[in-house]
Amino acid sequence: MDECLPNSCLLGVHLVISTHSGPQIVYHYPPSNTAFLTNNPTKHQHLYGNHANLNKNTSTNKEEKLFNSGSTKTASQIALNESAKSYNTAITPSMTNTNTNNVTLPPTRSHANTVGSQSSIPAATNGVGYRKTDIEDTSRTFQYQETESETSSSGLSDSELSTDYLDISSDSFSISSSLSSSSLSSSPSSSSSSSPPQDGLSRTNSSFQSTDSMSPTSPQMIMENDSISVAESYLDSGTNNKSRAASKRSQNFFHKLSTKKSTDSKTHSPVRKLKSKPSQSTKKGNKLLKNTSNETDGNAFTGSCSISSKKSLSSTGEHNQELRNSSLNDTPGQSPHHYHHRYHHYHKNAATSQRNSHTQYDVEEEDMEVSAMLQDGKISMNEIFFEEENFQDINKILEFDNDFVAEFCSPEREMCNTRFEFTVDNFCFLGLPIHVDSQGRWRKSKHKNKTRSKRSSSTTTNISRKKSIASKISSLSENTLKKVNSGEADTVYDSNIGHEASTDTPNLRINTDVSGNEFEREKEDLGKNMNMFHVCFVMNPHLIEYNKRIDDMYQFVVTRLSLLLRYVQSKTSYISSECHIILKEKERVLKHSKTYQSIRGAGNKGKYLYQRILAKSSLARALTECVDKIQRNEIACLEINDDKVISLQIPIQNEFEKMPNFKLQPVLRGSYLTSILNMKFLEKSSLRIESQNRQNDQAQFSDTNNNIYRFGNNINSTGHCGAANVDDGDDNESNYYCDDNDDLLNYALLLLDEPNNIISSLETFSYQDDIGTIILKHLVRNIQPNIPLRSYRYLITDLLDNPSSLDDLTTETNSLESSILRSCALHLMYWRHARIVIPLSSKYTYIVSPLAPIQGYTIDDYKSTSQNDGNVKKMDDRENNKSGSDRVPLIYQNSMLFRSKFPSLPSLPIFLSLLSTDKPQAYSNIIPSREHKPVYLNALAWLIQYGYVTQLLTFINIRVDKHIKMAVDEDLEKEGFRKTNTARRPSMDYKKTDKKLDDEDGQSRDANASEACSGKNEGMQSNDNNKDVDEKDNENDSRVDDRDDNEIAIADEEEILHFEYDDPEMQHDYTIILEPERATAIEKRWLYRCIYGQPSDIQILFNKLLKYFNGKVPMELVIIKEEISRHDLKKLLNALDKYLIEIHHW
């Protein structure tokens, strides 16, 4: 069993939503195959190593990458740079190669898609870029692309490439085919060349595409800035130059169609030449291509709009110009009905071309945004999942179809809002599905307004929903609005009106608002139809570790993330909005992105798709980061809805109160062996915060400015991991609240890293102007491990400029400064920057830890002792044999660090030998002089930080011997407690007296004696009165006596159960009082007898420290908490050495 080792067993995550049309998978990560994710010898190793070397030495060094916690930050930074580089290199040579001999059609590209070097950006004029095309090498280039496309797969199903989004009828094919048929007849030699068939394209359409695009007289269409300009290629270079100059001067192709006078302009002279073709060939071409279009599916046209179809689209647009001119001239042989029919097709085709142009422009502009986000580190994902040997179809999750996974991850409403655990083969699907209630609410309202009507409530909900949707749409259309307001945007054709829109800015704003309204309506429809969402995690733990791994994942990650998402969904419809963004972006990339279709390889295509989705959706970024960080056993800091921050982690078990059996259950080297557990404070604080959140609905999550309390969302609770309903209001609180006196401010903080590294990490995961971050950085710079936290209240007072009285103890404990200090300490503890210790002192005793990292080569060198996975053991043995001479043992690595940090001190082995003696002694015994004390204390802090040394604490128990018991028994007999009914029940007297004493206070012996005497007199009077009653009363008295005997017998059993280790019958010589603070009456008499005859100062000090003499609280902490001196404590121990037992333990 490896339960003590950090292993999340997490494979991936997927988001499922359920609407009226059924469940569907919105997003899943990673899209890797099952063999790679579940391969134990290499599982997660790429996550720990340096990402920069993965692409270089994937095959040779894949097995040599080990976990190194110290290089996590550097590796993540290098990984971001690699992501940006791989994003640029993922584009095919047809887009980035500057060699004109290898250039592919279409030769014109906007620099928006060219994110590589500056040399790959073509010259641009008026937003349109041109690239020269070598017609002689065209055939060879297309032949190479066709071969490459045949050997590569997109990893997509046919359903992903459907053309439901395009509103193009088969008539549009016939309209756009006249020019291509003419070019077929004019250049038969060009038909031998073929364009590369893209993924999802049929062979028929592919060959047709090539013949049209390879014609020397076919025009080339360049889409840029929502406009379409025509540049025609002719065999005559002079004519070609003139046509290109004319196309540069043109601002919009459809604007030229808006006026009849534009048909006589010079820019349309090439169109007249094209129109002078015989009309018979045009009619034949229309019939031929009409039949061809009926046989081809929608995927064919999508492919024609992807990469090589720029000429085809331009042919369509050019022939629409020709068709409009011929329609406006009303040529003979065409009826008015025929004119209107063709004019209707022109409007429809022009609107479609404009919509495709606008979509393509947005895609190219977003490519640049993705590249910028990659370079800035805003998009991060593990690229090894997208390698060709590891990537799988994006429509599958662990070789299961998306529909199959969506079905069983969408339970009924009665089974939602509780723990979901579904096992398929060796995989466990774990989650917390969130479903709306019968009234359509995501969560119960804490503040119900009974006087409000249902109609007003629904109206308010719709208004708030529209406001939230409008706020998100504004961010999407920000770039478009800027261009509209500056007058740089081009005109947009309005197909609904039937004529072209002018270039005025108000009309453009109206069109922008119309598209925004459509986006808003679709998003609102999805929000209304969605009734369930489920963030489901996939795991594959070992059978022997199944319960622990699953419970930890559910308790620390699944529950917290799902409840936060439910909160933001109920407030702002965040989940439905993000799902709509993901689905629309996925559809745009798969159907309209030429960059996507030009990329070769299924892995590169999938990587580009995920980069585009991550650039758009914050929810996708959060889920991706959560999986990557949890797999690396790191802390995932997720940003939800731009104003909610939550940190998730599965705590690493690196602290133990009892000695672990590390030979059978390996642990991390350098783990801490101590009774001061950090997790106890984190769990206690989490329970307190959750109870506050239950009382105040807006606590923690809604407060975005007071970021100092954000740690409350990060700390994990200790409730049961069962399938308790999340709507239950009861707390499953453990008995942590019983130790409220254990204040965190009585401890000291020991930093686990250099202060500069911690400060840089705080700046990365927090806001720069946050008051909490400022306090944390100031505290990290000044913290010392030998000073309690309560001594740093002056720092908070100086920063907040809020002086307070330090004289009142209540004010000092519950003040704002104290609360901020506790929050800062918990934050540093949760983020693994520090741990709490008892303030270091040279007068305390320290020993070498049994878990000291002496053996092994790294802190995670536990795999060699693994009993579960033979492959891992063999791999580690092979690595050890291959690089045995190059690897340095861990003790010598730390020795070099110790020597560099403390050059004036003995070496690490010698220093440890000084502490490891037969009889533990105070740390001051090894300090040579007073001048060496600061250096030795710093060395002690370093040794505790690396797990070499632990503190030997002192615990005290109270032992009561038989002499104390006999003295108390004699006192009870003198006071008359032993003389009641001794003749009739001699064996019950002692226990009955104990029962009477337990029911009383026991604070004062005199009060107890007087009460006992009064009870005795009343008993004697009752016995005298009983002599005068009749026989019937005597029978009743006997029944009462029998009932008293039964009650006493039951009380005796309870007494025996209460005293687990005590012996009331005094069969043993001594008794240990386990809980002096909750002592019974007889135990209090024993304690009073122990200090009887002692000086008053000893009695006062004993009563003050009595509650700590339970063997659980170390005396080193009591000295700080009660503010007493070691001398007073030593004096007390010497005076009561017969009754106080000292226990030395870690």
Curated annotation (Swiss-Prot):
InterPro entries: HTH_NPRL3 (IPR056603), Npr3 (IPR005365). Residues 986-1004, 1025-1042 have a biased composition (Basic and acidic residues). The modification Phosphoserine is found at S76, S486, S987. It comes from the Eukaryota. Residues 441-455 have a biased composition (Basic residues). GO terms for cellular component: GATOR1 complex; Seh1-associated complex; vacuolar membrane. Keywords: Meiosis, Membrane, Phosphoprotein, Protein transport, Signal, Transport, Vacuole. It is a peripheral membrane protein. Residues 150-159, 177-196, 304-315 have a biased composition (Low complexity). Component of the SEA complex composed of at least IML1/SEA1, RTC1/SEA2, MTC5/SEA3, NPR2, NPR3, SEA4, SEC13 and SEH1. Forms a heterodimer with NPR2. Belongs to the NPR3 family. PANTHER family: CGTHBA PROTEIN -14 GENE PROTEIN (PTHR13153), GATOR COMPLEX PROTEIN NPRL3 (PTHR13153:SF5). This is Nitrogen permease regulator 3. It comes from Saccharomyces cerevisiae (strain ATCC 204508 / S288c). The gene is NPR3.
